[in-house]
Amino acid sequence: MKALHFGAGNIGRGFIGKLLADAGIQLTFADVNQVVLDALNARHSYQVHVVGETEQVDTVSGVNAVSSIGDDVVDLIAQVDLVTTAVGPVVLERIAPAIAKGLVKRKEQGNESPLNIIACENMVRGTTQLKGHVMNALPEDAKAWVEEHVGFVDSAVDRIVPPSASATNDPLEVTVETFSEWIVDKTQFKGALPNIPGMELTDNLMAFVERKLFTLNTGHAITAYLGKLAAHQTIRDAILDEKIRAVVKGAMEESGAVLIKRYGFDADKHAAYIQKILGRFENPYLKDDVERVGRQPLRKLSAGDRLIKPLLGTLEYGLPHKNLIEGIAAAMHFRSEDDPQAQELAALIADKGPQAALAQISGLDANSEVVSEAVTAYKAMQ
């Protein structure tokens, strides 16, 4: 089996690329970073530090790389069995024209073996969005052929890959946590379902997308916002603070109650999942900075994201939400000189006051009880 993976950054090399190579798939990375491309083609291998209770170093081998903006990448799309991405949501649109060209070439060459494309991004139904961009870039006479022979498979991904703080100057070395989760929508594949260790197949992807958003992302953000307020440097420092831990765990339990109601998750299994996530936040090898995790507070306070969406679920089912409110209030206090959204948030609160500002950012009714609860909590933190 041959695969092409767009994005040879830390997540591409440390997570998806590693799983594919470990499964014995012939893997080519596509990227624009010439230093990384040259290193991959010189060595055909790289090291991944996998850190949990202990640290182990795995070597990923048998890989090569091409530029994502040249002809080579188009040729490969005409030949491979699987295309994956880890480029960031914004970049999906930029790689779509190359994918479209490759699909046209595949059709011209008469290659009718199934191709599956999986975007592995921190977003909901990212592959469906990529498909829209690819379809827009295709000539009309290729669209029906692509619909018939190419699967666009949505996925949910979860692995903490912090920015490399390695003392070496090796452009390929990467650190990842032991935990990883790659869940794909098995209803969207063309041809036989792949058997790749570390890839889980489901016919209910949205349940797992929300489970991650409402647990890992909610907990991570609240840990960062409360941690910043308490002058902690890292996520580990923050979660070891008992006061913060109680609120974070409480918020994940509140959002979890929504998931259990909505999707029928088993309550005991979900409690174990929350414990596992608290353990991930404590990982001593992950120097995860609270400022990095907290950045873009406007996005994180928007209606469909990790703080407001679970809160809306608690309102829908009439469930408690005291800790989620604490997290939202802490997010409103987030300040960072390096983050334009943090500055915009501060300006909005200064201009309109916390009540109107939160309503504008989150879409919540300014006169609602929850907004007033959040404003009370916000003022209590000043």
Curated annotation (Swiss-Prot):
Enzyme's top EC category: oxidoreductase
Catalysis: reaction(s): D-mannitol 1-phosphate + NAD(+) = beta-D-fructose 6-phosphate + NADH + H(+)
Entry GO CC: cytosol
Binding-site residues for NAD(+), renumbered to this chain: 3-14
MF (Gene Ontology): mannitol-1-phosphate 5-dehydrogenase activity
Alphabetically ordered keywords of this record: Acetylation, NAD, Oxidoreductase
Gene3D superfamilies: N-(1-d-carboxylethyl)-l-norvaline Dehydrogenase, domain 2, NAD(P)-binding Rossmann-like Domain
EC number(s) from the headed UniProt entry: 1.1.1.17
Annotated Pfam families: Mannitol_dh (PF01232), Mannitol_dh_C (PF08125)
Disulfide bridge partners, by residue number: none
Listed GO biological process terms: mannitol catabolic process
Highest taxon above the source species: Bacteria
Modified-residue entries (N6-acetyllysine), positions: 269
Family: Belongs to the mannitol dehydrogenase family.
PANTHER family reported in the protein's UniProt record: ALTRONATE OXIDOREDUCTASE-RELATED, MANNITOL-1-PHOSPHATE 5-DEHYDROGENASE
Protein name as it appears in the record: Mannitol-1-phosphate 5-dehydrogenase
Organism annotation: Escherichia coli O7:K1 (strain IAI39 / ExPEC)
